Amino acid sequence: APPGFTPFRID
């Protein structure tokens, strides 16, 4: 996964 990837949505 790329840097800063998150499996959760962040608005």
UniProtKB/Swiss-Prot annotation:
It is found in: Secreted. The keyword Secreted applies. One of its GO terms (molecular function) is toxin activity. Its main location: secreted. One of its GO terms (biological process) is vasodilation. GO terms for cellular component: extracellular region. Expressed by the skin glands. The keyword NADP does not apply. Keywords: Amphibian defense peptide, G-protein coupled receptor impairing toxin, Secreted, Toxin, Vasoactive, Vasodilator. It comes from the Eukaryota. Belongs to the bradykinin-related peptide family. Produces in vitro relaxation of rat arterial smooth muscle and constriction of intestinal smooth muscle. May target bradykinin receptors (BDKRB). This is [Ala1,Thr6,Asp11]-phyllokinin. It comes from Physalaemus signifer (Girard's dwarf frog).
